[in-house]
Design a protein with these regions (language model features):
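Residues in the short beta-alpha loop(s) of Rossmann-like NAD(P)-binding domains
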Residues: 136
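Cofactor-binding active-site loop characterized by glycine-rich and histidine/acidic residues
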Residues: 2-132, 140-141, 145-155
Length: 157
């Protein structure tokens, strides 16, 4: 099956207006496009580490996420989603959940490269069935643009 850009862009928004992200922010564009990869009937559980994307898109009552959403601490988005996906598999196996779900986790470069790599590594080792998206915006943007270990040497963040 080929990719159809027009069809993809006409899909309903799963990352809706109402967030507080900066205009043109890469994390927003990333989240919108990743969610557009889902089929219309797909049910999804979204996990997000504390970071720019979370603090700007999940401020009650202005929630931008149309799917089920879980906020986790900065360093453990992967282990949180690993637990959720494992519980889902167990409940599905017991017949307590009938629907199929997709699991997607977002984390920034600081929360992934610096303090979240052990959680991501553990989830991969356990064979967690989810998609992990690291949006590398070059720094810890929600705390004053400190560099992360993903920031290129001599970059001005």
């Amino acid at each position: 099956m080929g990719y159809n850009f027009k069809e993809t862009m006409n899909k309903p928004e799963r990352f809706a207006p109402g967030h507080r992200m900066c205009a043109g922010c890469g994390a927003t564009i990333c989240a919108r496009n990743v969610l557009r990869g889902l089929h219309e009937g797909d049910k999804a559980v979204i996990g997000c580490a504390t970071g720019c994307l979370n603090v700007s898109s999940f401020q009650y009552p202005y929630v931008a996420w149309e799917d089920s959403y879980i906020h986790s601490a900065f360093e453990n988005a992967s282990s949180t989603m690993s637990g959720v996906e494992g519980a889902y598999r167990a409940l599905k196996r017991k017949g307590k959940i009938k629907e199929d779900y997709k699991f997607i986790c977002f984390g920034g470069d600081g929360g992934t490269y610096d303090i979240g790599i052990q959680s991501l590594s553990g989830a991969m080792e356990r064979g967690t069935n989810y998609t992990y998206v690291c949006y590398d915006n070059g720094a810890y943007m929600n705390t004053g643009t400190q560099r992360s270990s993903a920031t290129p040497m001599y970059a001005d963040t």
